[in-house]
Amino acid sequence: MTGTEKTPAATPEFRLAYVPGATPAKWVRIWNERQPDVRLTLVPVEAAEVADVLRRGDADAGLVRLPVDRTYFSAISLYTETTVVVVPKDHVVAAVEEVTLADLADEIVQHPLDDVLEWESLPGQAAFERPARTADAVELVAAGVGLLVVPQSLARLHHRRDLTYRTVTDAPESSVALAWPEERTTDQVEDFIGIVRGRTVNSSR
């Protein structure tokens, strides 16, 4: 290298963490249209780990499930999900459009360790052992061992042809939000906030 040559500058990057079930594709597409010179990198992370990922600076912002620590994070609620019960297609619940928690009282209901719903009291009858992950719970439901209550996006994420789901009208709901460390509100974070809030290119912050 001669004295006149310069080291190429690193490509600017915005890292967006997202939890299972969150769907960043629409906002990523808009980002790529508006910020072609800033690479958006998606960082998949479990719901229980996303706060630590953001605290460590391994991502600039994240699509998370509420609640978050509002003393450290800023957050913008994006949407609240319908809660559903996942059942085998031949289960009696599959014959109706929606159910209540009382309808599940006599059923075994799987409660995985990574459950993202906040329960005052768990529905149904407890399984002998809690599965570690939602994916494991879905496998158990498919094997005829109980039912599973989850946000609709997770039911879709773990879709199987032999399973279906129905709305649970009185179950806790899960809200998805954009969150980031308040002390690290960068210009790129502000730009992404504008995208999720539907601002146009010419809108002010």
Summary of predicted features, one role per range:
Residues 1-17, 71-75, 94-95, 158, ...:
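Short helix-loop hinge/linker segments at domain boundaries
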Residues 2-16, 20-44, 52:
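Short alpha-helix C-terminal cap/hinge motif
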Residues 2-4, 27-30, 34, 48-83, ...:
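Short beta-strand-centered segments that line the small-molecule binding cleft or hinge
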Residues 26, 166-204:
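A late-sequence structural motif
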Residues 46-58, 112-164:
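Hydrophobic hinge/microswitch elements
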Residues 24-26, 93, 97-130, 138, ...:
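Secondary-structure junction motif
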Residues 69-76, 81, 139-184:
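Beta-alpha-beta core module
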